[in-house]
Amino acid sequence: MLFRSGLDVQYIHIKPRIIAEKFIENDGGDLYDYKIFCFNGEPKIILHIEERYTDKEERMFFLDTDWNQLPFNINVPLELDADLPRPANLEKMLDIARTLSQGYTAVRVDLYSLNDGSIKFGEMTFTTESGISRWHPESANEYMGSLIHLPGVDD
């Protein structure tokens, strides 16, 4: 595997494999993607993506864990939506992310929320967008960095 286009160096010594996953259907509806950014085992930021698997243009929104929209985005212009519905199972998704992220300084836990209320696991990653995404505005980089606390360094 070559790492010329991204910064996913944590995979460099892992033998490449092909993994086939079961297709996730959502009763004919959009598949809502929730990427939960966790720092030291605590969810802090949610990236909600919709229209990702449809013919419409993908939309993404960053939110805090109280479902307040944050004023930044990655790779696409900022879009504010005052009427973004809070998922009924948000607390359950945050609990899952909290459990899975224990022991990691910074990790993103990806989950899917289905129309029947079930939650499906997507992945965990240490390098969002392979570590090369462009945050808008630039101050979002500082905000994300401020959430990382390294024992022995921050003390």
Predicted regions and their residues:
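A short, polar/proline- and glycine-enriched secondary-structure boundary/capping micro-motif
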Residues: 55-62, 131-135
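Short, flexible loop/turn elements at secondary-structure junctions
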Residues: 22-24, 38-40, 113, 125-128
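A long amphipathic alpha-helix within ATP-dependent nucleotide-binding catalytic cores
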Residues: 8-19, 60-119
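Contiguous hydrophobic, core-forming segments of folded domains
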Residues: 16, 24-27, 31-35, 43
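Beta-strand scaffold of nucleotide-dependent catalytic cores
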Residues: 33-49, 60-61, 120-125
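C-terminal active-site "lid" helix and adjoining low-complexity regulatory extension at the edge
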Residues: 113, 118-155
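Short, surface-exposed beta-strand-loop junctions and turns on beta-sheet-rich folds
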Residues: 51-54, 127-129
